[in-house]
């Protein structure tokens, strides 16, 4: 059961949380180096 339920839970985590972390880290990188 867990093997069937895990991908349906793992895909949204990677699809939503990873881009959010990437955007946040990019934002902090820009703020830190003042590229704007």
Swiss-Prot record:
Membrane topology (UniProt): Single-pass membrane protein
InterPro entries (UniProt xref): PSI_PsaI (IPR001302), PSI_PsaI_sf (IPR036357)
The entry's keywords: Chloroplast, Membrane, Photosynthesis, Photosystem I, Plastid, Thylakoid, Transmembrane, Transmembrane helix
Biological process per Gene Ontology, one example term: photosynthesis
Domain of life the protein comes from: Eukaryota
Primary site of residence: plastid
Transmembrane keyword on record: yes
Pfam families registered for this protein in UniProt: PSI_8 (PF00796)
Signal peptide annotation: none
Cellular compartments annotated: Plastid, Chloroplast thylakoid membrane
One cellular-component annotation, GO: chloroplast thylakoid membrane
Parts of the chain that traverse the membrane: 10-30
Family of this protein: Belongs to the PsaI family.
Function: May help in the organization of the PsaL subunit.
Protein's UniProt name: Photosystem I reaction center subunit VIII
Gene this protein is translated from: psaI
């Amino acid at each position: 059961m867990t093997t069937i339920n895990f991908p349906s839970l793992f895909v949204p985590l990677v699809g939503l949380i990873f881009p959010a972390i990437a955007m946040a880290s990019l934002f902090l990188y820009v703020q830190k180096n003042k590229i704007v």
